[in-house]
Regions:
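Charged, low-complexity C-terminal accessory regions
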Residues: 1, 120, 165-167
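Short, small/acidic-rich helices and loops at N termini and domain boundaries
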Residues: 1-35, 71, 93
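Charge-rich, solvent-exposed alpha-helical interaction surfaces
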Residues: 3-6, 144, 165
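Catalytic cores of large soluble enzymes that bind and process phosphate-bearing ligands
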Residues: 12, 19, 41, 130, ...
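Short, solvent-exposed coil/turn linker segments
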Residues: 16-19, 118-126, 199-200
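P-loop NTPase motor core
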Residues: 26-106, 154-213
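Conserved P-loop NTPase catalytic core
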Residues: 80-87, 96-100, 104-143
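Conserved P-loop NTPase mechanochemical-coupling segment
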Residues: 136-158
């Protein structure tokens, strides 16, 4: 009977595990690499945000921006997206932005608005037409943005298609580089035959957790 129990246990396939001694060594290695600046998080313009994130955006992390409708989540992410490129020029990185709420054209419009210190209402000649000089500045600034390694997905998609697209970028365009994935926002993700929004968000979280590993 004891022999039978041992044989049955041989068929058990447990989850991967590690002893705390291994985790402790990994923690010390990480701390040493941070001290020696071998690992440097990506900076934003906001010191408080950087401090809350232990110095900035780190690899292998998922960050969730939460707020009521109209509180500026999309504007914050748009600015952060620009900062990651401009303030971390010593890093090779690619930004993949699932921009489901706002067309990529409008995303760039916000960047132009920020850089030129003009509202989008002014840029779009809603009240008064832009002068030729102002239009030239818009064109020059837009040309500089074309070199940024940012890729937009405008069309809302299912969780599976989002997963497929992230995997494609990991294996091709962003191979051996930082890949920053941005999704705005979760409620616009199409259903994969899930019954409610909570299931969609849950599956989406699984995709992001898998991608960060």
């Amino acid at each position: 009977l004891k022999l039978l129990c041992c044989m049955e246990q041989n068929y058990v396939n447990p989850l991967p595990f590690k002893h705390i001694s291994t985790a402790a060594s990994e923690a010390v290695t990480y701390i040493r690499r941070r001290k020696n600046h071998e690992i440097e998080p990506l900076k934003s313009r906001w010191n408080k945000f950087n401090e809350m994130c232990c110095g900035g955006i780190e690899p292998g992390c998922v960050y969730t921006i939460v707020g009521a409708s109209g509180t500026g989540k999309s504007s914050f992410v748009n600015t952060l997206e620009t900062d990651l490129i401009e303030l971390n020029s010593n890093k090779e990185l690619v930004v993949l932005s699932f921009s489901f709420e706002m067309l990529s054209r409008a995303q760039v419009g916000r960047k132009l608005s920020n850089k030129l210190r003009q509202t989008t209402t002014q840029l779009y000649s809603a009240s008064e037409d832009l002068s030729d000089k102002e239009l030239n500045l818009v064109e020059e600034t837009a040309e500089s943005l074309k070199d940024y390694p940012i890729y937009y997905v405008d069309d809302a998609a299912t969780v599976q298609k989002i997963d497929d697209t992230i995997t494609y970028f990991q294996n091709t365009i962003a191979k051996d580089k930082w890949l920053i994935v941005i999704l705005d926002h979760t409620l616009l993700v199409n259903s994969d035959n899930y019954k409610d929004e909570r299931m969609i968000i849950s599956e989406l979280e699984r995709v992001f957790i898998k991608a960060k590993k």
